[in-house]
Amino acid sequence: MKLAFVNTADIRDARKYSGTPFYMTKGFENHGVEFSAITQLKNQLPWQFKVKRLLGKISGLQESSRFNIHAAQNYAQQVSGQLQNLTVNAILAHIANPIAYLDCQQPIVLWTDALYAGLLGFIDNFSAHSAATVEHANTLTQAALSRVKLAIFSSDWAARSALELYGVSKEKVKVVPFGANFECSHTLFDVRALLRLRSPKLVKLLFLGKEWQRKGGDIVFKVAEALHKAGQPVCVDFVGCMPPQGVTVPDYINCHGFISKHDPIGLTKLSQLMREAHFLFVPSRAEAFGIVFCEANAFGLPCLTSPVGGIGTIIKDDINGMKFALDSDVDSYCDYIMGLMQNYSRYEELALSAFNEYQTRLNWQTSTGVVKQLIAEL
């Protein structure tokens, strides 16, 4: 099978889009798929856009170059020009923009984690978009969905947005979760060894998130405090963002700041933190998917989170973690954590089950194999 992977950025750069196109491509290549990359497209905008963007800064509304019909039409021209010199079976994209106005003979496949209308009013920075940007974004998204033969989504939540908000026919909508965005060769033997290193007395929580409010950093601090007051020894490794000014950091919380997994030292540190933790604790208030939960499961690390966005497709209660409602009180978290620590064999079963979810569902080898078969059936 030969595919053309269309993207505005370089799919060979693991830093782009959290590494999703990079690891997606590697997964397909492991199944013998040959790729032609049509990437690093130029974002060409009309002069009027710059004027609108300037006016938007005054009004407080944002004109987005990412969601612009003129730019999307130009992307299509660039892609079409490069396609003329290629022989491929299908076109694959993980964002809608470059395929929204693409006319070609080959079937087009979109495999993404979210659609614009599903993010509007859900992710905070979308709320500042101007009316023109909202119109452009929905128009080009609808255009992309009308062109694709397959609309594949990483979660049931995203798939519902296609069906309910854009009226996409059920026949072309599929759900295939993304995988972990790093190299992992852990075996069940390895994970059992990791479990023997985790203390059955001191519970270690790991927070990974660059946004304090959206990722639920405040909840993590409150739960850690409650565990400490209840007499449960606790240690939190807090990675990504720093607490806001005025937030007291107790001695049982270690704030590491941002650690990049794209440099060897950072990756080694993150891997160490995941090996040592009992739970990944990221109670997000909004999340399109949550690759980090797949990555945690690769270490036999169960996840404590919330049932928002695409998380429900990744985390299954008492199988690879637990989801708590956004209005859950602190005691709900504490009771769950302490219950497992006091019956440690149950925790170990949960950790092994989490690794099984990674091995069977939440890895790129499995996911790309499923999508390859879907494309072959077109």
Where in the sequence are the language-model features?
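Carbohydrate-associated surface elements
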Residues: 157, 179
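Conserved donor-binding/catalytic core segment of Leloir-type glycosyltransferases
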Residues: 193-215, 221-226, 236-237
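A short, well-ordered alpha-helix in the C-terminal region of glycosyltransferases
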Residues: 339, 346-361, 370
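Short hydrophobic beta-strand element within catalytic cores of glycosyltransferases
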Residues: 302-305, 315
